[in-house]
């Protein structure tokens, strides 16, 4: 792919989430065994319309396990990442799992929309996939109208974005986007993945909202298997690129991608990016903005 800047990085969430300032100093945003939590994982960060940095994470109460008591939290920085606020609880549902943050900033209203997932704390991913769990994965949306200082009650949107025969489901984990192109300007788009009942293979998909996050629709689904944790970026030509963690190692040991030409409603066949070798890991995708406009440069 031409005119693409590729920056590969892997964030080790077990020890903490780091922000690198221009002075080459580091600030620990989250550290394990602090603030009443054993571990912090699954990061997402956005800049609000007011310029505040919002760093989301799963706050895992008792261990680094993917199951059990997991809360969604955020920290705020009003000075470009030099200092950070105390932990703000976005969603705490007792002993259950609240996770996979996918935040989006509405640049028109300033509202911060957060799409995320839930499951019973006692249900493990394998049980959910095998349909032996007590419940399943559910999808919710929350929002903040005061720059991330407080958050709404979660609203369930599962029936709008998840087929009944899907077992596992996960949003992101990464930021979502608000489209800038003329055709679908203002649309909110989030990348996600799922598994169909009776199978053991992941597929990626897009979900979108045309009313500022009030209602959501299921968009394009990648037919080829292997796509897992995903991120989405808007390209200069108005297309969207869905970039995916790849479990189909027989095809390629690199990240995979698919293109949407209609704002996320449908997606192309899966292809692979030979430049992006990965060990099956979450990865973020960003468009490098130039003078406030979308450019040809993409950061991975």
Task: Give each language-model segment a name.
Residues 1-24:
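Bacterial Sec-dependent N-terminal signal peptides
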Residues 22-300:
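Asp-box/BNR beta-propeller blade signature and adjacent active/binding-site loops
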């Amino acid at each position: 792919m031409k005119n693409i800047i590729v920056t590969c990085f892997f964030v080790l969430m077990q020890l903490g989430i780091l922000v690198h300032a221009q002075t080459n100093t580091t600030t620990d945003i989250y550290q394990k065994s602090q603030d009443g939590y054993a571990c912090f994982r699954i990061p997402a960060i956005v800049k609000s319309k007011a310029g505040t940095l919002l760093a989301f994470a799963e706050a895992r109460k008792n261990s680094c396990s993917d199951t059990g008591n997991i809360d969604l939290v955020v920290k705020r920085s009003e000075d470009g990442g030099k200092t950070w606020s105390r932990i703000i609880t976005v969603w705490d549902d007792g002993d259950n799992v609240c996770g996979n943050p996918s935040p989006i900033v509405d640049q028109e209203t300033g509202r911060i929309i957060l799409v995320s997932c839930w499951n019973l704390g006692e249900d493990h991913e394998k049980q959910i996939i095998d349909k032996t769990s007590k419940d399943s994965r559910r999808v919710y949306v929350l929002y903040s109208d005061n720059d991330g200082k407080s958050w709404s009650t979660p609203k369930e949107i599962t029936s709008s974005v998840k087929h009944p025969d899907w077992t596992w489901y996960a949003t992101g984990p990464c930021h979502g986007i608000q489209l800038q192109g003329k055709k679908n300007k203002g649309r909110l788009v989030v990348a996600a993945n799922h598994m169909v009942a009776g199978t053991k293979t992941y597929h990626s998909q897009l979900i979108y909202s045309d009313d500022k996050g009030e209602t959501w629709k299921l968009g394009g689904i990648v037919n080829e298997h292997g796509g897992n944790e995903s991120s989405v970026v808007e390209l200069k030509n108005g297309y969207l690129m869905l970039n995916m963690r790849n479990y189909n190692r027989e095809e390629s040991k690199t990240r995979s991608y698919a293109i949407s030409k209609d704002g996320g409603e449908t997606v192309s066949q899966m292809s692979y990016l030979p430049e992006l070798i990965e060990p099956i890991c979450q990865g973020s995708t960003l468009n490098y903005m130039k003078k406030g406009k979308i450019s040809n440069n993409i950061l991975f």
